[in-house]
Amino acid sequence: MALNLQDKQAIVAEVNEAAKGALSAVIADSRGVTVEKMTELRKSAREAGVTMRVVRNTLLRRAVEGTDYECLKDTFVGPTLIAFSNEHPGEAARLFKEFAKANDKFEIKGAAFEGKIQDVEFLATLPTYEEAIARLMGTMKEAAAGKLARTFAALRDKLQEAA
């Protein structure tokens, strides 16, 4: 189905808006993946706050101009599926990585975060906000407990010297 100029402009504008509001982007090739599997991926993406779209490469190049994802232009070869993470930078990467494990034909081409091409593994392992807070609290709690133990040990040693 051929797209007229207005349709193309609408697609470019839509993808550009998604790119401007996104925290990260991941590019993949979904050739050979069944429609049923792609429907499952789209459903998972919606639930995770990820915007996914298959876009023609020429339209995608125009859509990402002037955004942080312009660095991905070299990966726009062949059928291109782009996913933008809206709530957490690693969400799209994590989603695509899990999907690629289950589907051999699904190939992740690249990812970008803060205007730079990043490794998908790096993005997928970024902690969520809640995980980061939990790690910080655990570290603080551990440090406080260790300091308290050292204080009691010093007090015990001081009392033993005095006796």
Curated annotation (Swiss-Prot):
GO terms for biological process: translation. It comes from the Bacteria. GO terms for molecular function: large ribosomal subunit rRNA binding; structural constituent of ribosome. InterPro entries: Ribosomal_uL10, Ribosomal_uL10-like_sf, Ribosomal_uL10_bac, Ribosomal_uL10_bac_type, Ribosomal_uL10_CS_bac. SUPFAM superfamilies: Ribosomal protein L10-like. The keyword Iron does not apply. CDD domains: Ribosomal_L10 (cd05797). It holds the Pfam family Ribosomal_L10. GO terms for cellular component: large ribosomal subunit. Keywords: Ribonucleoprotein, Ribosomal protein, RNA-binding, rRNA-binding. Forms part of the ribosomal stalk, playing a central role in the interaction of the ribosome with GTP-bound translation factors. Belongs to the universal ribosomal protein uL10 family. Part of the ribosomal stalk of the 50S ribosomal subunit. The N-terminus interacts with L11 and the large rRNA to form the base of the stalk. The C-terminus forms an elongated spine to which L12 dimers bind in a sequential fashion forming a multimeric L10(L12)X complex. This is Large ribosomal subunit protein uL10. It comes from Haemophilus influenzae (strain 86-028NP). The lineage of its organism: Bacteria, Pseudomonadati, Pseudomonadota, Gammaproteobacteria, Pasteurellales.
